[in-house]
């Protein structure tokens, strides 16, 4: 047990501790911070527009790496610049999942979707897509789950969360996560309480940069924004290199004038969905849609989100699903519960096998 606890402590205090950047309003962001943040990514992929099967184009190997990262390509080995059947199949599935016209070609709408900031969790696992995009027989339900439908045990309806201590987050930032947890608590029987102990908490949240020990390195601003594990592992990692905007929680959806700032609550609500067992959805208005444009704020659960989470846990017994059941904050300390951490360390080893993210 001592060895395991030491491993946990080493993980949190040696993997690229970072002071993430938070802004309370757009005007406080230095102008140079948000100039052409996605230009490099677009320039990298825009030259691929219009190419089709049978061609060999410089840069297609990077696109294949992107598709492999998110589960659309399952083959191993080096990626080539050949537009082959494997790539065409990946494009077809991607277009279907994101409600694009299925052409198997790299049209501009597909490429523009690819360069949008997004969640780092894959859309397909073991080559199987659960997003249901474009399926005729299931037109209203597009939510998905992790393989095997993992969920928190029925006996555990009071979950605790803690923040990685090296981030030194302010109370203002922590309140953003409290609001995000509340949105899921309002429609389920789950309750969420903040703890000060990462060893005692069910869920641990941290901001990291680049490679941070779980095999899923972050790529800098405006790429992958965050990733989270399925239950009951309970890890939520966010990219500390993003320009995170902290709103006051009064506006549920808006488009900000600066398109390279990322709304923290929007990402937090999405990743908590993963922590509770939801996969990605092909409903663009749903919280669990994989991508979010820079400057967008989306925090209200859609019908698809609510139906998905209630499929796992049922509704809120204290209301009709829309009542207020705020997450609680406490000063819990101590504790040496490590059962969850065994699952975490096994998960980290599994995740690190072959997944990596292209930098563009």
Swiss-Prot record:
Keywords: Cell membrane, Glycoprotein, GPI-anchor, Hydrolase, Lipoprotein, Membrane, Metal-binding, Metalloprotease, Protease, Signal, Zinc, Zymogen
Tissue spec: Mostly expressed in leaves, roots and stems, and, to a lower extent, in flowers.
pH dependence: Optimum pH is 7-8.
InterPro entries the record matches: M10A_MMP, MetalloPept_cat_dom_sf, Pept_M10_metallopeptidase, Pept_M10A, Pept_M10A_Zn_BS, Peptidase_Metallo, Peptidoglycan-bd-like, PGBD-like_sf
Taxon lineage: Eukaryota, Viridiplantae, Streptophyta, Embryophyta, Tracheophyta
Domain remarks in the Swiss-Prot or TrEMBL record: The conserved cysteine present in the cysteine-switch motif binds the catalytic zinc ion, thus inhibiting the enzyme. The dissociation of the cysteine from the zinc ion upon the activation-peptide release activates the enzyme.
Reported temperature dependence: Optimum temperature is 35 degrees Celsius.
Protein name: Metalloendoproteinase 5-MMP
GO annotation (BP), single: defense response to fungus
Family: Belongs to the peptidase M10A family. Matrix metalloproteinases (MMPs) subfamily.
Residues where Zn(2+) binds: 119, 270, 274, 280
CC cofactor note: Binds 1 zinc ion per subunit.
């Amino acid at each position: 047990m001592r060895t395991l606890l030491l491993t946990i402590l080493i993980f949190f205090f040696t993997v690229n501790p970072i002071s993430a950047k938070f802004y309370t309003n757009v005007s406080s962001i230095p102008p140079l911070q948000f100039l052409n943040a996605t230009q490099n990514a677009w320039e990298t992929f825009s030259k691929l527009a219009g190419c089709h099967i049978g061609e060999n184009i410089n840069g297609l190997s990077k696109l294949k790496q992107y598709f492999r990262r998110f589960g659309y390509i399952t083959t191993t080995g080096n990626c080539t610049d050949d537009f082959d059947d494997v790539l065409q199949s990946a494009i077809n599935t991607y277009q279907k999942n994101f409600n694009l016209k299925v052409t198997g070609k790299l049209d501009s709408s597909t490429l523009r979707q690819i360069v949008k900031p997004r969640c780092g969790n894959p859309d397909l696992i073991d080559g199987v897509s659960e997003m249901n995009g474009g399926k005729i027989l299931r037109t209203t339900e597009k939510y998905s789950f992790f393989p095997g439908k993992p969920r928190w045990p029925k006996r555990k309806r009071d979950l605790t969360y803690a923040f990685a201590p090296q981030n030194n987050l302010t109370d203002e930032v922590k309140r953003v996560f409290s609001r995000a947890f509340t949105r899921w608590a309002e429609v389920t029987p789950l309750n969420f309480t903040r703890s000060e102990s990462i060893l005692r908490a069910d869920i641990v949240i941290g901001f990291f940069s680049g490679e941070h020990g779980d095999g899923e390195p972050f790529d800098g601003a405006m790429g992958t924004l965050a990733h989270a594990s399925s239950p009951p592992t309970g890890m939520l990692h966010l990219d500390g290199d993003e320009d995170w905007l902290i709103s006051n929680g009064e506006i549920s959806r808006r488009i900000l004038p600066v398109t390279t700032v990322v709304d923290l609550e929007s990402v937090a609500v999405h990743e908590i969905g993963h922590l509770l067992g939801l996969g990605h959805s092909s409903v663009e208005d749903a919280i669990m849609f994989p991508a979010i444009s820079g400057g967008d704020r989306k925090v209200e659960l859609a019908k698809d989100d609510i139906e998905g989470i209630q499929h796992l846990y049922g509704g809120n017994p204290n209301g009709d699903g829309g009542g207020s059941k705020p997450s609680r904050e406490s000063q819990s300390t101590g504790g040496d519960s490590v059962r969850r951490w065994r699952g975490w360390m096994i998960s980290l080893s599994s995740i690190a096998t072959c997944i990596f993210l292209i930098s563009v």
